[in-house]
Amino acid sequence: DGEQALQASLSVEEKLXIALCLEKTGVDIMEVGFPISSPGDFKSVQTISKKIKNSQICSLARCIEKDIDIAGEAMSVCDFFRIHIFLATSRLHMKSKLRKNFDEIIDMAIFSVKRALRYTDDVQFSCEDASRTTIDNLCRIVEKLINSGVKTINIPDTVGYSIPNELSFIIKNLFQRVPNIDKAVISVHCHDDLGMAVGNSISAIQAGARQIEGTINGIGERAGNTALEEVIMAIKVREKNLGVYTNINHKEIYRTSQMISRICNMPIPSNKAIVGSNAFSHSSGIHQDGVLKNRENYEIIDPVSIGLKNVQLNLTSRSGRAAVKYYMNEMGYKDSDYNIDELYSDFLKLADKKGQVFDYDLESLAFISKQQDELEYFCLKFFSVQSISNGLSTASVKLLCGKKVYTESSTTSNGPVDAIYQALNRITHFPITLQKFQLIAKGKGKDALGQVDILVEYKKRKFHGVGLATDIIESSAKAMINVLNNIWKAKQVNKKLKILKKK
């Protein structure tokens, strides 16, 4: 659901990296895609289904036979999975969107459930726009769905319209009025249009819901979804009051949040609860004094409990790979999370440039190296830029394309970044349009790493790229190379899928 907020679709590799992070964090179920929507989404669901072992895989489908069949096919590589089907139940959606009456809606829902049960005995059903559905209709369809074999009933506040006492009222009524309610798990799926997604989710827990749907950092369509890290920590901090617990590995929360922020190109607001950079900052003198005496005076959460560690790095170009590996382990990274040879090579280059390397530098390098595939088709071997005072620039690049090396110079351009991009385009001939360019400082001071995130459009599809270096122009060039490789990979996936369809 979170991907709907992104300007560019994630690649298969990026989705897998997120899935592995979520698995390590300990989420029970992850909804990994909508396989009917595109060949890329089908491939992502299939790939993740093969790799994830400790979390249950779930796939989304409409109440359409082909949707359900494709979802079942995509996940058939794993032993146990869930199909999540949905259909609107509110009067507004039935009248203006579906143009069907409630009896027809029930028939469609039951037929789809039976279809899904051919593939798995774990079916979840969402009554879309449930918070604006009459309670009588909601109770009626929920009872029939449970009788048909649905194990999880999801109550979505699809447009973020509900307030906590209203959603609590809906959940309580289901428990009071649906005779077979004990045979299913009640779930809620809240949106944040009125800023109440987390509050609504907590009120639903108090009313009896035992599954909460959400996204890390609250990423989602419009104003976003329930921020999982906020619900998780609310449950942990107020466990006695709420009477429930989770199986989450809390110490993975911060790193997962940071990783997803980077992959999705969505910076975390500094005042974001739990994971924002100011979440554990104290500027008031009174507060600072109180925290120094006892952190519990002004902190209800121990920063260490979510994975924040005060690791003091003192790494220079004289530090060995054992030291780099030690600090990565101290920050919570496992050996399988990064390639030590690649990371150490990048570390030495950075240390030679800026002297001392900090924890955030190492994390950024590890993230970028993880994004790079060993078999990248495009590789930037060399570039040079010349600029003059009126803002005009020219650039020369040497680009490895597969096994061939091409050299190209750009004509006069408006700035060094545009000059490099024009030179690269003269070699690749990809009809791309730059839509967004963003520079983020990773660290502090004049030697901070600069991360460039770009968004381009290629044949009506959007692609995201990221580059990291102490030099902004180099970061920009690397970001475009990342984009070009993502486009090339997408083209290869489409070719393979066309061949499979012919077979």
Swiss-Prot record:
Mn(2+) binds at residues 1, 189, 191, 225. CDD domains: DRE_TIM_IPMS (cd07940). Its cofactor is Mn(2+). Keywords: Amino-acid biosynthesis, Branched-chain amino acid biosynthesis, Cytoplasm, Leucine biosynthesis, Manganese, Metal-binding, Plasmid, Transferase. Residues 379-503 are annotated as: Regulatory domain. It is an enzyme of class 2 (transferase). It catalyses: 3-methyl-2-oxobutanoate + acetyl-CoA + H2O = (2S)-2-isopropylmalate + CoA + H(+). Coiled coil: none annotated. Residues 1-254 form the Pyruvate carboxyltransferase domain. Gene3D superfamilies: 1.10.238.260, 3.30.160.270, Aldolase class I. InterPro entries: 2-IPM_HCS-like (IPR050073), 2-isopropylmalate_synth_dimer (IPR013709), AIPM/Hcit_synth_CS (IPR002034), Aldolase_TIM (IPR013785), LeuA/HCS_post-cat (IPR054691), LeuA_allosteric_dom_sf (IPR036230), LeuA_bact_synth (IPR005671), PYR_CT (IPR000891). Pfam families: HCS_D2 (PF22617), HMGL-like (PF00682), LeuA_dimer (PF08502). It comes from the Bacteria. One of its GO terms (molecular function) is 2-isopropylmalate synthase activity. It is found in: Cytoplasm. Its EC number is 2.3.3.13. GO terms for cellular component: cytosol. This is 2-isopropylmalate synthase. It comes from Buchnera aphidicola subsp. Uroleucon erigeronensis.
